[in-house]
Amino acid sequence: MSKFFTNFFVSAKGIFKKASTVQKIALGLIIFFVILALVFLIGFSTKSQSIALFGVEIKDQYLLDRISQRLDRENVKYFLSSDGRIYLDDEKLAKKMRAILVREELVPVHMDPWALFDIDRWTITDFERSINLRRSITRAVEQHIVALDDVDAVSVNLVMPEKALFKESQEPVKASVRITPRPGSDIITNRKKVEGLVKLIQYAIEGLESDNIAIVDNSGTILNDFSNLDGIDRIDLAEKERKLKLKYEAMLRGEIDSALSKVLSVDRFMIARVNVKLDTSKETTESKEYAPIELQSQDPKASYNTRKVSDSTIISSQTQKKEYQGQGYSPWGPPGQEGNTPPEYQDLSDITGKYNESQEIKNVALNEKKSTSEKEPARIVGVSLGIFVDGIWNFVYDEKGDFVIENGMRKREYKPMALEEIKNIEDVLQSSFEYKPERGDSITVRNISFDRMNEFREIDENYFASERFKYFLFIASIVFSLLILVFTIFFAISRELERRRRLREEELAKQAHLRRQQALMDGGDDIGVDDVVGGIREGDELQSNAELLAREKPEDVAKLIRTWLLKNA
């Protein structure tokens, strides 16, 4: 290897001596730039990279200022990017400051709670791991609660004691939660939402019981103390009963409208009142019945009764009989002494007696049937209806068959509804829903004249307006017809006068032309100036008449010229 390097340097030295000055300068520059590039690459690769303090951007400006102040107190150099991220130069220093900030809870809210365990240090202890676990669980629960629509902010504090050797000595896990309700939320008074929040916290933390959870609002009121919500529950129950009552009444009102609209027009009846009485109490009934035991069922093919029943079935029986017959004996006292038997019994001592006893015990089984019925908590116990029905309004006519006008309106007569029709309406209403008179249901239908004055006035105003418009159209049509007739007559007379004038002018022109021809034929000397001037004047007048006729009726003039050309041809 040493020989190789020796030969390499010898050959390089020989080549360098043989090279020209320009080549030597170029080679030196190349070597210089290569060395400079190597130095730059080595310096760049050994330079420490910026380490992000947290993997997420810090959007809260107040939190960002607190973190910056804490880093300044530790005399740490850091770089703040435009997106709210903090970068440090040393990775070890970043881990140290991250642990300090986590301990002082200066961590972004939207940061992953379990990112605390991404901190790798050789010197981390079990105590620090338990603290990190508690903080991660706390932050996870806070993020879970803040995600609810009814919570604006939350603060969770967990007490997780160390595991004891004996179960009896183990302290329970406890949690205190302070929430800030969102404006417009009813989580403070809504028991179901509070219970859901308790379940959410209980299931998120291992070993936590619902009795060890305290949830308060900003004023310090305990929300999960349900003993204070009994009054609110009663109010909610009353509100639900009211809404249910209104729902039943609306349904019944719709059924009545549907039933009455089939026999009456909508404007002829009015539902004055629909009252539904509800019983929301829960009622459970237990009954016990004894029925005969069926020994043989009814034969479906037999026309007579083949069914055999028994009141009971004997399970066991016991019969006992006792009989005794003999002389009764009344004992006396000691010998030589009179006994204590009363005198009335001493006379019966020599009478023979007879005793019979008969006893029969039977154990029977009865056909016993027990039933338990539970009524629905919301049932209708009474319905009362009040309905007004209007009669019929008919117009009043005079002897000529025209409307009778009274006070600027057409006169009307009211015809009340017959009692039979009212009874039919009540029958229709009774069949439209579950009508039960035994539970106190009542339906009242009364015939009352509705106030229709404004309605009639509007109808009559429209009627009179339409009549006036019809009369105006009639007069206008007559006037228009007369105008058309006048214009037609005027146009016909004008045409006739024009036709006569043209005929007269043509006749005069023809006579003048004949006179001129006659004069020319007679020698021409006798033609006077008046005849020539008159002929010129008549020719001009004839030309003007021809032009006027061509303007008024160009088609007739064209036909006349066409005919004249054909004749001359």
Swiss-Prot record:
Q: Choose one Gene Ontology CC annotation of this protein and give it.
A: bacterial-type flagellum basal body, MS ring
Question: What are the annotated disulfide bridges?
Answer: none
Q: Which domain of life is it from?
A: Bacteria
Per the record, which residues fall in region Disordered?
281-348
For this UniProt entry, which segments traverse the membrane? 25-45, 473-493
Which keywords does this chain's UniProt record carry? Bacterial flagellum, Cell inner membrane, Cell membrane, Membrane, Transmembrane, Transmembrane helix
Q: Which membrane topology term applies here?
A: Multi-pass membrane protein
Q: Kindly indicate whether the keyword Oxidoreductase belongs to this entry.
A: no
An annotated GO BP: bacterial-type flagellum-dependent cell motility
Q: Does the keyword Secreted apply?
A: no
The entry lists its GO molecular-function terms as: cytoskeletal motor activity
Which segments show compositional bias classed as Polar residues? 295-319
List all Basic and acidic residues biased stretches.
281-291
- Cellular compartment(s): Cell inner membrane; Bacterial flagellum basal body
NCBIfam families the record matches: fliF
State how it assembles.
The basal body constitutes a major portion of the flagellar organelle and consists of five rings (E,L,P,S, and M) mounted on a central rod. The M ring is integral to the inner membrane of the cell and may be connected to the flagellar rod via the S ring. The S (supramembrane ring) lies just distal to the M ring. The L and P rings lie in the outer membrane and the periplasmic space, respectively.
**Similarity comment text for this entry:** Belongs to the FliF family.
Per the entry, what this protein does is: The M ring may be actively involved in energy transduction.
PANTHER family for this protein: FLAGELLAR M-RING PROTEIN
Task: List the protein's name.
Answer: Flagellar M-ring protein
Q: Which gene encodes it?
A: fliF
